[in-house]
Amino acid sequence: MIDLSSLFGELDIYLFDQLLRGRIAGGMTVFDAGCGHGRNLVFFLREAYPVYAIDPDPDAIRSVRSLAQRLAPLLPASNFRAEAIEACSFPDHSADVVVSSAVLHFARDEAHFRAMLEGTWRLVKPRGLFFCRLASSIGMEHRFASLGGRRFALPDGSERFLVDEPYLLAFTSELDGELLDPLKTTVVQDRRCMTTWVLRKGA
């Protein structure tokens, strides 16, 4: 029997959906912008995708380098760097697929959100895929306590920068991106909302 957890790791289910729909194919360069300890990278490393990743936490990058050494030993350690997204040293148009999973909602304010988003978007190749999952207020608009601006206290005890549909659609237009799927939001039992935002970059 196939060990699915060994094959896919803890791959985000909505990112898995992009794989199933053929939008992420073998040989595409994958960049995880805010990779943590690599939960979304196991499959791509195991299947020999060209993989790059950044995270501001040096411990997380050490973990990802160790994971890559085990699953894809031919990838250089320099593919994985301890850097903030808004100060990323990788060049523009680095990847066919750029993943931003549970990252942008850690923005301090709107200026920081914009810097993080623009730092991520520039990495996407023309006609490339941008996959983003982030906290939002969609579906629970009246359940969050404002901390000023777009920062809110959530019922689960966390504090997040929250987007909404008009905010994401405005950025979609500003970035000249093509919305590949309608915005999809999961409400987690009156605790928080997570929205999936998938764009195709223009030529």
List the predicted regions and their residue ranges.
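A short acidic, Gly/Pro-enriched loop at the edge of an enzyme's catalytic core
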Residues: 86-98
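Non-membrane alpha-helical structural segments and their capping/turn regions in soluble enzymes
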Residues: 58, 110-114
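Class I (Rossmann-like) S-adenosyl-L-methionine-dependent methyltransferase catalytic domain
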Residues: 1-25, 30-31, 36-87, 130-203
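A short SAM/SAH-binding and catalytic strip from SAM-dependent methyltransferases
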Residues: 97-111
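A short glycine-rich, Lys/Arg-flanked "PGG" loop and its adjoining helix->strand segment in the class I
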Residues: 114-126
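Flexible, active-site-proximal loop/turn residues at the rims of small-molecule/cofactor binding pockets
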Residues: 104, 116, 136
